[in-house]
Amino acid sequence: MWTEKAAAMAEAQESGCRNKSSISRQTPVAGAVTEDDEAQGVFKPMDLNHVIKLLEETNKDGLEEKQLKFVKKLVQCYQNGLPLRDLAQIFKILNLCAGKIKNQPRFIESAYDIIKLCGLPFLKKKVSDEITYAEDTANSIALLGDLMKIPSSELRIQICKCIVDFYHAEPPKKHIPGYQQACSSYKIQMAEVGGLAKTMVQAVTLLENQLVEKLWVLKVLQHLSTSEVNCSIMMKAQAASGICAHLNDPDPSGQLLFRSSEILWNLLEKSSKEEILPQLSNLECLLALKEVFKNLFMRGFSHYDRQLRNDILVITTIIAQNPEAPMIECGFAKDLILFATFNEVKSQNILVKGLKLSNSYEDFELKKLLFNIIVILCKDLPTIQLLIEGSVVLALFTYVKKPEKQRTIDWSAAQYEELQLHAIATLSSVAPLLIEEYMSCQGNAQVLAFLEWCEIEDSFFSHGNSFHGTGGRGNKFAQMRYSLRLLRAMVYLEDETVNTDLCEKGTIQQMIGIFKNIISKTNEKEEAIVLEIQSDILLILSGLCEHHIQRKEIFGTEGVDIVLHVMKTDPRKLQSGLGYNVLLFSTLDSIWCCILGCYPSEDYFLEKEGIFLLLDVLALNEKKFCNLILGIMVEFCDNPKTAAHVNAWRGKKDQTAASLLIKLWRKEEKELGVKRDKNGKIIDTKKPLFTSFQEEQKIIPLPANCPSIAVMDVSENIRAKIYAILGKLDFENLPGLSAEDFVTLCIIHRYLDFKIGEIWNEIYEEIKLEKLRPVTTDKKALEAITTASENIGKMVASLQSEIIESQACQDVQNEQKVYAKIQATHKQRELANKSWGNFLARTSNAKTLKKAKRLQEKAIKASRYHERPQHAIFHPTDIKGLNTTVPSGGVVTVESTPARLVGGPLADTDIALKKLPIRGGALQRVKAVKIEEAPKKSIPT
């Protein structure tokens, strides 16, 4: 496996390599180079096995000189690079030389020269050499770490230089025909495979008292720790704790601290937190970090010192996330709190006496890091006393106000804004733990005053160029967002002192005002942060008004209006991901906490069609909202005015509320795995409500105070709420239900009976499991209850069958009616076609016309009385002078008054006639005429 890993890593670097099934390895040769050959860069054959045998020989005269001569010759031969095929033999020679150093010190130079060669490029003759010799190369490089045990400072330093050169590869000095340089990362990969990092970590412990060599080893580890593989190896070798514990060791150059912190940083970044934090969370490591940080904080004035100080603080912050870290025991937590607050709260502590932060970037970052570590420290409850002693809340509240021109530290506007937001965010975590300190600082008053400033339009310009300032550029949304988060955190403590103080200061009215102000100013660019602000306002109002009728009355109609405004949001926006879902949840919560229970608010909500809006959201079939909406509707149904509104609602395709609720019931049962047939009928009359989960769970005896599975089922799904709503709407008078709905309604109607039967069945089964024998009367009672429950199931199943059969009959009747209608339509078309054919025949054939006329006259004659009644008026059927091709039909127009007297239809007559006709008969339209007066006759005298 180890060989395969090495080969795979090498193969990944050299794409297009040929697979080599079998490679015949010959005796490696190296070149003894003449001057001419060296100029050409060609390796001459040299028997490395002979050199190895020579070094293995002992007790011969002049042998040492001969051995040194051959090693020197070898070094000269490979001065341009090491071929991969010869690497195993060369390192074997190196190992033999190292073994002779103890008794023959002259071999130090030979070993030194060979190690120096390892810094040269590795050469390959074939593309596949990197894969073929991967195992040999990895073993050879691993040997370098083992050689660190040789007590030679010069040799150790050279080994470190050689390894560092792996990361700074240089091209070969001369090009050697037939060879090419291995890829630049090949040595690094082979070092990973060979586990070089482990031996180098062990070397740190070995060289504790030898500073120069130790610094070189740390430099090597600094390079090695850039790889995740090496970091994993180093972690197994306990590198983190070993390096961290010696951070504060004396070192005039400062390299030890720099390189150690860099290694720790890489280990934290590239290793799993679960593995590294336990190594660093010990008293020794934290004491070392504490001393280093204090020294850098108090005496570090250079740019480099400040950067290193911040790096140490970041490492400490990560360690502090581990609850097991003894931050309090080592005194580090107390010092960090002091450093975080000494600028805002005066302290006589000698550590900060005379200290002052500048507005440099490093000090600015330090301030943010200190705020951040306070948030982490406050998660450990024993730290609370330190936070109180350090006046952390008071220090943080110095930022909860309008920016001032004169400040302790001359931060830039952008820096101060970011610190202000960071401080308020920190307060959101700290203040809920320190309620007394919060109230003693008049926290509510300060936050509400700050919110008033956030609403005012003034010359303040927000930069919005930080994480906390996101979405707040050119406005005060970021400040408002974090202030509301702080208030929300305090309100949800449900501390009556805090909430009463807020209400007395007019928080409810102020929150409603802020909400109205925000919705009046549409800002699409900052939509996400605006939605978050609205959600927080509604949550604050919910927290304040819950269980308090007087506060609900203060919420009043203005509060209901903002709730209704949110409820009218376009449903398509719920899928936008901007926060509309959260806002809707907050709105539903505010309906529950701020409206329900206050009858004037409930009535106003109903008047404004609030129930319609709730049902509209319910009809969206979003499961995450259903449970909450149904719970709200159950409470609303206690109001007698609600039923009319619910029954009046109509959804898509004229769906009623009852039909919607029954549809939700069916969907819920399908998801729960309740057994029903294709028509929705009960299958198992003994367990009509059983879910698949209940079927899987075996009944086990439980204590009396533990709810059983049947009881828990009531609260874990929406069936009980649907039953309650339909029960309050009256099961007998639900409009707009189909036969399928009625089948389901039969089950819903008996939900409570079925559930009671389930619980009694559980009791009976538990008694059996516990092997208890109830008295005869109790046993009979249990059996009677079980039988009654089953009978109810059978009765409901029978009723469902009747409904289904009745619907089937109704469907058949409807089908027959439709079929009869279709038949009548076809028959009418046939009659119309026949009539049209007769008409065409009469108009095209005179004989047919005469025949039709005779038949008509005959029919008319047959319809008359044979004896004419007395005083009867005879009306002829033929109209003289009528020129038509069609004889008169069966409709006879009778006019007893001549048309000249009628004057046409009366529909067009003027009501105000100028002059009545003098001819009698019906009124007719006459033209207005001017009547001239008759000449007066002279009366004879």
From Swiss-Prot:
Gene3D superfamilies according to UniProt: Leucine-rich Repeat Variant
GO cellular component: cytoplasm; non-motile cilium; sperm midpiece
Domain of life of the organism encoding this protein: Eukaryota
Subcellular locations according to the entry: Cell projection, Cilium; Cell projection, Cilium, Flagellum
Pfam families: CFA69_ARM_rpt
UniProtKB keywords: Cell projection, Cilium, Differentiation, Flagellum, Olfaction, Sensory transduction, Spermatogenesis
GO terms (BP aspect): cell differentiation; olfactory behavior; positive regulation of fertilization; positive regulation of flagellated sperm motility; response to odorant; sensory perception of smell; spermatogenesis
Purpose of the protein: Cilium- and flagellum-associated protein. In the olfactory epithelium, regulates the speed of activation and termination of the odor response and thus contributes to the robustness of olfactory transduction pathways. Required for sperm flagellum assembly and stability.
PANTHER family linked: CILIA- AND FLAGELLA-ASSOCIATED PROTEIN 69
Protein name, entry field: Cilia- and flagella-associated protein 69
Organism: Callithrix jacchus
Higher taxonomy: Eukaryota, Metazoa, Chordata, Craniata, Vertebrata
